[in-house]
C-alpha cells in the first residue's frame, strides 16, 4: 500500500466523518476556551483555530485558515455556537490576548443581538500578573495542552501539501479527540 493510497483513504473517511463531527450536539457547558496555533502547508504558515467546551473537553469549533484574521475566528465560533439558541447563563469565553476574539464577539452581537452578547475574558501572558489571569489561567492552559496534543500528531507529517489535506487531517483528528480518546 502506497502513501498515496493511505492519503486517499483518509480523505474518504474525513469526508464521511466531518459532517457528523461538525453537526453533533455536544451538550455544551457555560465555559468555552479558544486558541489558535500554526501549521505548515507547503512550508508556509497556516493556522488552526480551536474552540473547546471546558467542562466536557470536547472540541466544538475548529477551522483551518491561511491567515490569522477575524474571519476564520468567526467561522470557528459559528461552529461552536451552532447548536445554541441562546448562550447559557453565566457564559464565559476565555481566550488569549489576540484581538480577533473580541472582534468576533462584536460580530455575533451585531448579527444575533442580545441572545449572543458576551465578552471575551482575555488571559494575557505566561504569568498571573492580575486577578483575571490568576482566576482563568487553568482554562488557557487547557486549550494550550490541546494545541500541543494536536501538534504531537501533526509533527510527523512534516506539514501538509495543501489546505484540503490539512482539513481532512483535522476533521479526523477532532473525531478521534472527541469520540475515541479517553478524557480524564
Predicted stretch roles:
Residues 5-27:
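Short, basic alpha-helical nucleic acid-contact segments in DNA-binding proteins
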Residues 41-47, 54, 58, 143:
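Short, flexible loop/turn motifs enriched in small residues
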Residues 27-42, 50-52:
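Two-metal-ion RNase H-like nuclease active-site motif
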Residues 133-183:
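Charged alpha-helix within mobile-element recombinases
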Residues 88-103, 123-126:
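Acidic/histidine-rich, metal-coordinating catalytic segments
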Residues 11-12, 62-86:
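Active-site beta-loop-alpha junctions of metal-dependent nucleic acid enzymes
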Residues 97, 109-138, 142:
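Conserved beta-strand -> loop -> alpha-helix junction used to position metal-binding or nucleic-acid-contacting
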Amino acid at each position: 500500500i502506497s502513501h498515496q493510497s493511505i492519503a486517499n483513504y483518509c480523505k474518504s473517511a474525513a469526508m464521511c466523518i466531518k459532517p457528523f463531527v461538525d453537526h453533533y450536539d455536544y451538550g455544551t457547558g457555560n465555559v468555552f476556551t479558544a486558541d489558535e496555533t500554526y501549521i505548515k502547508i507547503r512550508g508556509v504558515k497556516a493556522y488552526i483555530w480551536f474552540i473547546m467546551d471546558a467542562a466536557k473537553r470536547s472540541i466544538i469549533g475548529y477551522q483551518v485558515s491561511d491567515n490569522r484574521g477575524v474571519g476564520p475566528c468567526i467561522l470557528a465560533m459559528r461552529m461552536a455556537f451552532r447548536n445554541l439558541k441562546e448562550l447559557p447563563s453565566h457564559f464565559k469565553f476565555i481566550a488569549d490576548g489576540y484581538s480577533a476574539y473580541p472582534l468576533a464577539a462584536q460580530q455575533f452581537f451585531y448579527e444575533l443581538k442580545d441572545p449572543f452578547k458576551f465578552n471575551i475574558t482575555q488571559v494575557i501572558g505566561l504569568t498571573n500578573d492580575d486577578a483575571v489571569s490568576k482566576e482563568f489561567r487553568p482554562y488557557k492552559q487547557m486549550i494550550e495542552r490541546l494545541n500541543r496534543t494536536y501538534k504531537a500528531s501533526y509533527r510527523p507529517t512534516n506539514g501538509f501539501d495543501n489546505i484540503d489535506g490539512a482539513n481532512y487531517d483535522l476533521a479526523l483528528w477532532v473525531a478521534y479527540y472527541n469520540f475515541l480518546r479517553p478524557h480524564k
